[in-house]
């Protein structure tokens, strides 16, 4: 799936060291940018994403340097004049924030995440972090999304695929009565039994709060550990902390969750000397992942923050 034509950037685009730091005849040195994240970072939904089927889940190692040319890792790398050996995509689909803590601390998840179905072990994960000059962190959406989608499936005996797709698509982002109608239309099409309807209503109007409260606790506990783990490996790296886009503002629980997370991330960045990058309007596709324009927007936000 790799885009071979993106494999190397022209020398004149590479980031050069100051003249007095170079020796005559030596090639110009490049920075190294490493993007940590989940499926948003990896480029799920874009053409040319690379992966292999693994014994458990998927092997994303081919995507570390063979990522889609339209994902924000590629676009940030291009903006910084980096080739693919110096712009690394460590996005791991379905990753949740405690999983990223494990990856940063030991390059491995100790066991499979049963809720998300993910399990990753990459010895090179920490090595990439040690060599990085700039590291971006994107994590936390799955901490709420995965249990919400699983809970909706269990409540409806898995009749909820269309409603779940609508919820994560971004189609409900801008509230109006037409979109509220879409939501209830999808809900009614599921032809639920009385017990299923009761369980679904409880989840949507109460259970979501419980899920999002627990997710917020998990993410706010994990993010400082992720930052500390990165600094233990690489105290000199510049760390960029990405904010959050809410694909379902129609649901009050999700509004509160992402609003609180953005405030927490911004405060954490100020306390820890990180670069906070707000991405509230990243456009998403029907699967809830950024579109090409969404990745362009995220990349532009990062590059502007690095200026």
Question: Model-predicted segments: where are they?
Answer:
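Serine-esterase "nucleophile elbow" of acetyl-processing enzymes
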Residues: 15-93
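Alpha-helical cap/lid subdomain in secreted, periplasmic
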Residues: 113-307
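Short, solvent-exposed loop/turn and secondary-structure capping segments
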Residues: 44-48, 100-102, 146-151
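Structural motif
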Residues: 95-107
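Residue-level detector of flexible, active-site-proximal loop/helix-junction positions
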Residues: 40, 94-96, 246, 283
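Surface-exposed intrinsically disordered loops and tails
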Residues: 49-67, 106-121, 177, 199
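Sec-dependent signal peptide cleavage junction
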Residues: 1-7
């Amino acid at each position: 799936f790799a885009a071979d034509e993106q494999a190397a950037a022209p020398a004149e685009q590479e980031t050069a060291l100051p003249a007095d730091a170079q020796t005559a005849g030596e090639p110009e040195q490049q920075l190294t940018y490493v993007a940590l994240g989940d499926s948003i970072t990896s480029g799920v939904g874009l053409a040319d994403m690379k992966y292999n089927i693994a014994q458990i889940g998927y092997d994303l190692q081919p995507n570390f340097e063979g990522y889609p040319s339209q994902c924000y890792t590629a676009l940030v790398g291009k903006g910084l004049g980096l080739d693919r050996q110096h712009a690394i995509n460590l996005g791991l689909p379905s990753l949740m924030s405690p999983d990223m803590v494990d990856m940063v601390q030991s390059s491995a998840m100790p066991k499979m995440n049963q809720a998300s179905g993910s399990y990753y072990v990459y010895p090179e994960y920490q090595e990439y972090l040690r060599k990085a000059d700039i590291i971006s962190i994107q994590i936390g959406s799955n901490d709420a999304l995965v249990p919400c989608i699983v809970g909706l499936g269990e409540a409806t005996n898995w009749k909820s695929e269309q409603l779940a797709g609508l919820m994560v698509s971004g189609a409900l982002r801008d509230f109006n009565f037409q979109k509220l109608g879409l939501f209830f239309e999808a809900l009614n099409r599921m032809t639920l039994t009385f017990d299923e309807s009761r369980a679904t209503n409880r989840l949507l109007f109460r259970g979501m709060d419980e899920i999002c409260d627990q997710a917020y606790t998990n993410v706010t506990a994990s993010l400082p550990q992720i930052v500390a783990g990165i600094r233990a490996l690489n105290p000199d790296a510049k760390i960029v902390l990405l904010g959050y886009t809410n694909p379902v503002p129609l649901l009050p629980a999700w509004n509160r969750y992402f609003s609180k997370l953005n405030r927490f991330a911004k405060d954490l960045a100020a306390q820890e000397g990180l670069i906070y990058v707000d991405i509230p309007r990243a456009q998403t596709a029907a699967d809830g992942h950024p579109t090409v324009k969404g990745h362009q927007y995220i990349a532009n936000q990062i590059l502007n923050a690095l200026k």
